[in-house]
Regions:
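Glycine-rich, highly charged phosphate/nucleotide-binding loops
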Residues: 41-46
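Short glycine-enriched, charge-decorated loop/helix-capping segments at active-site entrances
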Residues: 34-40
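Conserved phosphate-binding/catalytic loop of the ribokinase/pfkB sugar-kinase fold
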Residues: 117-121
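Surface-exposed amphipathic alpha-helical tracts and adjacent flexible/coil segments at the periphery
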Residues: 1-20, 24-34, 47-50, 56-84, ...
Length: 704
């Protein structure tokens, strides 16, 4: 049966989830999770929570799905070790350094690929399986058909979000909160700037980045039928009563194999919505109708929530059925066998019955006494008593027999498995290169690559794979290297075409492929190209670099969320690169921001055109409340990539030359060909030039 996974942002929410039918809960422990402001659990609370859940047949998943620095890794390893010791069933991860660490420290604990890994293709899931992960949480942006295609062919379990908040950006790829305010969504501190007002033509008069919550209740049965192993409910930041309401409805739908009633849909909306719900991604219908905000007048339904709260606080609705078999014989210890539905079975003995001097106990009276399980997590579903005639048994002896049996059964159900433990070993310290970095350049338009740029000296030119047919690779061979940048987001159906494009690129002299997602490793396998990691791999620590080296990468771009000291201190087992110039990418979105506002004649659910004659060719600018303008660029598959309004500029800052980088990347997006050359000349100290509206990015301030 498909598992229902509910959020547990605190003890009360955990009880609400379990009592209303959750098969599993996900929760935080310590500070390393994607909802740091949720009420996470202390050691004592976490152990008690695991026991509470396991007693009732509910699994517990720990969220360690954030990016972690080298200094934080030892504490994370210890957190994971204690969670394993307390019996956690699986751990969700995003950071490849965390993955490496957990495989070494707690090798027997199952790992799940978090949605923060941005897995959205069969190839990505297959790569997660190759690495030993047992489950992949897919991106929310997939359609029902795409979900089915993956679920039916996946070698590991598939989990998908069924209800709750939708981020505008693909999870794990959003930098908006980090770049604008220093609060990283990749470290559990997202400030949700996407919920604010933005607009066009200099006005912030709408909410074009605020999606309604997803509601896939109508498709719960369909997803179960297609082989989805787990339906996940979002909401670790929401009230426990919300968790109770949504869990209860989805549990009933899965248990009873039916569609939601109109009343249930009304209750889901009453619990929480942003001006209604959306199923747009699941149905493959992107567009403006998917967007909404929570009205300022919205209030929690306190009366209904009070009823829900009273139910899960005062009554254990999640009792474990047990079968009793009792045998009473004169002069022999009483025997009681208790068995649950999960294969646990115990047998206990009690005081020996004596011959009755007056009234003898009956089998029915023994059964009635054994069925009194109040105050426990058990209920007797069946009780068979075999008793000789003429016996006397004190009620206290029967009570003790029942208590002993249930205590023994509880011990079995909450038993913590024996697991191996390893030792955390920090990455080997490798001395930083002392030479200044060589410059690479990524381009967005073919016209940005010119003789003048190449003549100034660019070690490698990064070109989007889909742009390569328009680039004169042959003209510049021998004067610079070319690297094909794979799309940040694609679909399983695109993969053969992408492989063919890579083969063609290699034949033309493109030597290198740039990977930004786990699924890319499958796309390039067997092509014998040099492989470099892009910023999308979110390299935040030395262990992540070590992992990427083991996967065959010859270089990697470090996360631009890192401060220069953190960039310096990473142990560079392979050549490292950092973005030192350009508009930093804030979001990549499945919904085309431009098409939603201006329309697009190519926009028919998906688009193979380059959008050269559409609105997004001009890089329209989204405006925020303070007048900052954010260019929106076209991305592969008719998606949008939102850029920062200010340009990262470090040409006048010598620190980036002294932190062990092999390459320094100039990221060109909206620049003219002439501007590209001037930027490169400025970074090489050959021209006095500074663009307008610059920022130092996160190079000095870093992120929370």
């Amino acid at each position: 049966m498909t598992e229902l996974l509910s959020p547990a942002g605190g003890r009360e929410a955990l009880v609400a989830a379990v009592q209303n039918g959750a098969d599993a809960v996900y929760m935080g422990f310590g500070s390393f999770n994607a909802r740091r402001s949720a009420r996470n659990f202390s050691d004592e609370e976490f152990l008690a929570a695991v026991r509470y859940c396991h007693l009732r047949g509910v699994k517990v998943y720990l969220t360690l799905n954030t990016l972690v620095t080298d200094r934080e890794l030892p504490a994370l390893a210890e957190t994971a070790r204690r969670a394993s010791e307390y019996g956690v069933d699986a751990i969700l991860v995003q950071d490849w350094g965390v993955y490496e660490t957990l495989r070494a420290v707690i090798p027997d604990v199952p790992l799940h690929a978090s949605t923060q890994m941005a897995l959205h293709t069969l190839s990505g899931v297959e790569e997660a399986a190759r690495l030993g992960m047992t489950r992949a949480v897919l991106a929310r942006e997939l359609s029902g058909g795409e979900l089915r295609e993956i679920a039916e062919r996946a070698p590991i379990e598939i989990e998908t979000f069924a209800h709750g908040a939708l981020c505008m950006c693909y999870s794990g790829m959003c930098e908006m909160s980090a770049v604008i305010g220093g609060r990283s969504g990749n470290r559990g501190a997202c400030a949700q700037p996407c919920r604010l007002r933005y607009g066009w033509h200099g006005k912030a008069d709408a909410n074009p980045l605020s999606l309604k919550d997803a509601n896939l209740a109508a498709y719960a049965g369909e997803m179960a039928e297609m082989g989805v192993a787990c339906l996940k409910l979002e909401g670790r930041m929401k009230r426990p009563e919300y968790v109770a309401a949504v869990t209860g409805i989805y549990a009933a739908l899965l248990r009873e194999h039916r569609a939601p009633t109109a009343d249930e849909q009304k209750k889901l909306a009453l619990a929480f919505s942003r001006d209604g719900f959306t199923d747009g991604y699941y149905r493959g219908r992107r567009g403006k109708e998917m967007f909404g905000v929570r009205p300022e007048t919205a209030r929690w339904p306190e009366e209904w929530f009070g009823t829900l709260r009273a139910a899960y606080e005062k009554e254990d609705m999640r009792l474990v059925p047990v079968r009793f078999r009792a045998a009473l014989r004169l002069g022999e210890p009483m025997v009681l066998t208790a068995e649950d539905g999960d294969g646990h079975c115990v047998t206990v003995t009690g005081a020996a019955p004596e011959a009755a001097r007056s009234r003898a106990v009956t089998a029915g009276e023994v059964e009635a006494r054994l069925r009194k399980t109040g105050g426990t997590a058990f209920t007797v579903s069946d009780c068979a008593v075999t008793a000789e005639n003429g016996l006397s048994v004190p009620a206290s002896a029967l009570n003790a027999l029942r208590r002993d049996a249930l205590a023994a059964l509880e011990t079995l159900r909450t038993e913590i498995p024996e697991r191996r433990e390893g030792t955390f070993v920090p990455a080997e310290r490798i001395k930083n290169p002392t030479e200044p970095p060589r410059f690479t350049a990524s381009i967005y338009r073919a016209g940005q690559l010119t003789d003048a740029l190449v003549n100034e000296g660019v070690e490698t030119v990064y070109v989007p794979l889909e742009l390569l047919p328009s680039v004169e690779v042959e003209k510049y061979r021998g004067r610079t290297k070319f690297a094909a940048v794979l799309p940040r987001v694609w679909r399983t159906a695109d993969e053969e075409g992408l492989r063919e494009q890579l083969r063609t690129a290699k034949e033309r002299g493109v030597e290198c492929a740039v990977l930004g997602n786990l699924g890319h490793f499958a796309l390039v396998r067997g092509l014998d190209m040099e492989l470099r990691g892009d910023f999308g791999l979110n390299v935040f620590n030395s262990a992540a670099l070590r992992f990427l080296k083991e996967q065959g990468l010859s270089g990697a771009t470090l996360s631009f969320e890192l401060r220069h000291e953190q960039l310096r201190d990473i142990s560079k087992c392979i050549p490292c690169e950092a973005i030192v110039y350009g508009r930093l990418p804030l979001m990549i979105t499945e919904n085309c921001i431009v098409a939603n506002e201006f329309g697009c004649r190519h926009f028919k659910g998906r688009c193979d055109a380059a959008c050269a004659d559409s609105a997004c060719a001009a890089a329209p600018e989204l405006t925020d409340r303070v007048g900052e303008r954010f260019p929106v660029l076209h991305a592969y598959g008719c998606r949008s990539e939102l850029q920062n309004g200010k340009t990262l500029w470090l040409a006048d800052k010598p620190e980036y030359r002294k932190i062990g980088l092999t390459y320094a990347r100039l990221r060109f997006t909206t620049e003219s060909a002439e501007e590209c050359v001037r930027v490169l000349r400025a970074y090489k100290g050959r021209e006095e030039y500074t663009p307008k509206d610059i920022t130092r990015g996160l190079f000095y301030r870093g992120v929370e």
